[in-house]
Regions:
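DNA-contacting surface of Y-family translesion DNA polymerases
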Residues: 187, 197-341, 359
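Short, glycine-/Ser/Thr-/acidic-enriched flexible segments
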Residues: 40, 49, 299-301, 352-354
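Acidic, metal-coordinating catalytic segment for phosphate/diphosphate chemistry
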Residues: 314-403
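A glycine-rich phosphate-binding loop feature that marks nucleotide/adenosyl-phosphate handling sites
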Residues: 146-149, 232-236, 288-299, 341-353, ...
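Gly/Gly-Pro- and Ser/Thr-rich, intrinsically disordered tail segments characteristic of DNA damage-repair
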Residues: 1-231, 364-403
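Short, charged/polar, Gly/Pro-enriched secondary-structure boundary elements
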Residues: 117-121, 302-303, 353-359
Length: 403
C-alpha cells in the first residue's frame, strides 16, 4: 500500500440501541429483542434474532405485539439518556487509540488511520474492537478503505459477509469488483431512497452497475455529490475526516404526547419540560440562542390536524430556563385554542452565539418573569411502558451489586 494513500476507517456499533439494553439486561442476550420509538409506536432497533424472525424497521408495535409475545421477545421503550451516555463512552475509547476521530452519529465514528504503518493497522483495528467491547460491552464492526465511502462499504461487508469477524480492510478483499455486483445500491453511503429509486428505474440494482455509469449521467441524476460518491467507490478521496464537529444550526426539544390534551396547563407544563431539556443540550454545546421557534400541533392521524408556530426573538442571548420560559409563555398562551386537542409541542433553538461572547444580562428589566407550571396532571407524558433504567445517568437507578 502506498504511503500516500489515505486509510480511512469507520467504527460502527452493531444494533446499537439493542446492544445498550443487553449490557444491563443480559436476559435479552440470545433472545429476539426490539427497541420502540417515542410513545412505544414503532420498531426502531432490532437484534439479529428479531431480524431473522421477519421484524422490519418501522413496523407498528401494536401489529406485532401478539407475535412478539408468542416468540418471547424482549421489548424496550427508547431510553435516549442511556444510549447517549453509552455513545460517549464508546467514542472516548476510540479516541484513545486514534488521533483523528469524527463522531458521525450516535453509533458511528470515522477515523483517519493514515499515520498508522501498514503492518500495524490490523492489530490496531482488533485492539479498538476488543477494547470497546471490554470497556463498554458494545460490539462494533470496523471497515477501512481509502475514503469514507469505501470505509462504509467495508464496514457493511464486515457485518454482513461471512468470514470477516467484524473487521474488513479494502486492501485485503479478493475480487473486489465482482463483489460490488453482489451488493445493492441501497448500501452506498449517501445514496438515499429517492436516488435508489431513480437508479433502479434505469436498471441499476448493484454497486457494480453504478460505478459503470457515465460520469455526466451520474452528475445529472444525483448532482455533484453523487459523482463524488462514484469517484470514491473507484478509490479516489473526496470527503476528509473532520474531527472538529460542525456548529449546530439548531437544537430541538420536541415530543408527541402519550395522549391528546386539551388543557392549557398541561400544554404549558409539557412546553416547560421541553425547554428544560433543550437548555441542557445548549449547555452541553456551550452555546446560547438568540431566537427559538415554538410550535403546537394536533393529531395528524385524526381530524385535529391543526398546527401553529411562532418565532420568539429573545431580548438577549440566553440559556436561562426562567428567561426563556418567561418570553415563550405569552406566545404559547395566544397560540392555544380552547376546545382544540393537541398531540405534540416543542421548541427549536437557533441563531447561536458561543458561550464566551454571550451578550446581555441574566435578567432584563423589560422581561416579566413567569413562574413555571406545577402540580399539573401529566397526561402529556410519553408512553414508555417498557423503559429500562437510566443505568449510567441517574444515581437513583444505578445498578446494585451484592457481594
Amino acid at each position: 500500500m502506498s504511503s500516500t494513500i489515505k486509510k480511512i476507517g469507520i467504527v460502527d456499533c452493531n444494533n446499537f440501541y439493542v446492544s445498550c439494553e443487553r449490557v444491563f439486561n443480559p436476559i435479552s442476550i440470545g433472545r429476539p429483542t426490539v427497541v420502540l420509538s417515542n410513545n412505544d409506536g414503532c420498531v426502531i432497533a432490532r437484534s439479529q434474532e428479531a431480524k431473522d424472525l421477519g421484524i422490519k424497521m418501522g413496523e407498528p408495535f401494536f401489529q406485532k405485539r401478539d407475535f412478539m409475545d408468542e416468540h418471547r421477545f424482549c421489548v424496550y421503550s427508547s431510553n435516549y439518556n442511556l444510549y447517549g451516555d453509552m455513545s460517549d463512552r464508546v467514542m472516548s475509547v476510540i479516541k484513545k487509540y486514534a488521533s483523528e476521530v469524527e463522531v458521525y452519529s450516535i453509533d458511528e465514528a470515522f477515523v483517519d488511520f493514515s499515520n498508522i504503518p501498514d503492518e500495524e493497522l490490523t492489530d490496531r483495528l482488533h485492539l479498538i474492537r476488543n477494547e470497546v467491547k471490554r470497556l463498554t460491552g458494545i460490539p462494533v464492526s470496523i471497515g477501512v478503505g481509502p475514503n469514507k465511502t469505501l470505509a462504509k462499504l467495508t464496514s457493511y461487508i464486515a457485518k454482513k459477509k461471512e468470514g470477516y469477524n467484524g473487521i474488513c480492510s479494502y486492501w485485503t478483499l479478493q475480487n473486489f469488483r465482482n463483489l460490488l455486483y453482489t451488493i445493492s445500491v441501497d448500501e452506498i453511503w449517501g445514496v438515499g431512497r429517492q436516488w435508489s429509486k431513480k437508479l433502479r428505474k434505469i436498471g441499476v440494482d448493484s454497486i457494480g452497475q453504478f460505478v459503470m455509469l457515465n460520469d455526466s449521467l451520474v452528475r445529472k441524476m444525483m448532482t455533484v455529490n453523487g459523482l463524488k460518491t462514484k469517484m470514491e467507490l473507484l478509490g479516489m478521496y473526496c470527503h476528509p475526516v473532520k474531527p472538529v464537529p460542525k456548529q449546530k444550526k439548531n437544537i430541538a426539544s420536541t415530543r408527541s404526547f402519550g395522549s391528546d390534551i386539551d388543557s392549557f396547563d398541561q400544554l404549558a407544563e409539557a412546553m416547560y419540560s421541553y425547554i428544560k431539556n433543550g437548555v441542557k443540550k445548549l449547555e452541553d454545546n456551550e452555546i446560547s440562542p438568540n431566537r427559538a421557534t415554538i410550535f403546537i400541533a394536533g393529531n395528524r392521524h385524526k381530524e385535529e390536524k391543526h398546527h401553529n408556530s411562532k418565532v420568539v426573538k429573545f431580548e438577549s442571548q440566553t440559556r436561562d430556563v426562567t428567561q426563556i420560559w418567561s418570553q415563550v409563555y405569552p406566545y404559547l398562551r395566544k397560540m392555544f385554542k380552547e376546545g382544540k386537542k393537541y398531540k405534540k409541542c416543542g421548541i427549536i433553538f437557533h441563531e447561536f452565539m458561543p458561550e464566551n461572547i454571550e451578550q446581555g444580562t441574566l435578567f432584563s428589566n423589560t422581561v416579566q418573569l413567569v413562574q413555571p407550571p406545577v402540580n399539573v396532571e401529566k397526561n402529556w407524558e410519553m408512553r414508555q411502558e417498557y423503559m429500562s433504567q437510566k443505568f449510567t445517568t441517574s444515581w437513583e437507578e444505578i445498578p446494585s451489586v451484592f457481594v
